[in-house]
């Protein structure tokens, strides 16, 4: 469990979940792009369905592969350009790790080719990615971190991996998920809140609708385009696009089958679940709700952090703050956990 004494230094104003979320997303990205002295190189891999996935690797100036690789699965409409991707890249550099961000389909700046996109329960995609990585890297140790939607998919995959429903990846030593919507139904309801709908749903839908239009142009009739264009909530979008495109009956079927909350009891691998109590998108869970059965699964529920926020040492005069607090804590947890194995 991360040290409870390691808490972010926040102004009371920024203890608000919305402000934590928005500040980190906007100012964090600007600050990290300005201060980070690294760049990514892209490798494109052909998928089994004749599509492609882009893996963005942190360029290693030492030209030697690290014995440890950190793999990041991003959140909804994220990419290697997201604030948290840049933050974890910095942590990888601090620890001399290799680092790669997996851009989900359609998230690397180019529309994918197949009649599909990405979704919160795509365990087959996670499995294919990790097996591909396992086949091409020489690192002795692999850690994975999943952010929001990517965290839910990663956690659901791990539960299946630990039940031997997917082949064993012996070099995978631990995973961490941050702000993951473990229960998509309750998260969906929270996004339908009037304030959340205005702030977050409209933001996500702006780009998701554009991608959906491109997908319809590729595959006319794949879904009801008019319903997608008219969608005003994530629930409506998932019911009109995500569910039918990925062979779910409807949004309720998609959310129920893709949620990881009922899968956690099957996990035996070293795992850390981090959800802030003031997350405006993901409900805060009581540890009893998660039905954790293994001592290897840890749950941390800090008071502050928002949705993938967790900024600290906020200085309004200089319009800056520290955005590496949570990624650094997770990096330290990976190191500590691996030492005890």
Regions found by a protein language model. Give the residues of each.
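Short beta-strand element of the alpha/beta-hydrolase
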Residues: 66-75
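Catalytic histidine-centered segment of alpha/beta-hydrolase-like enzymes
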Residues: 305-323
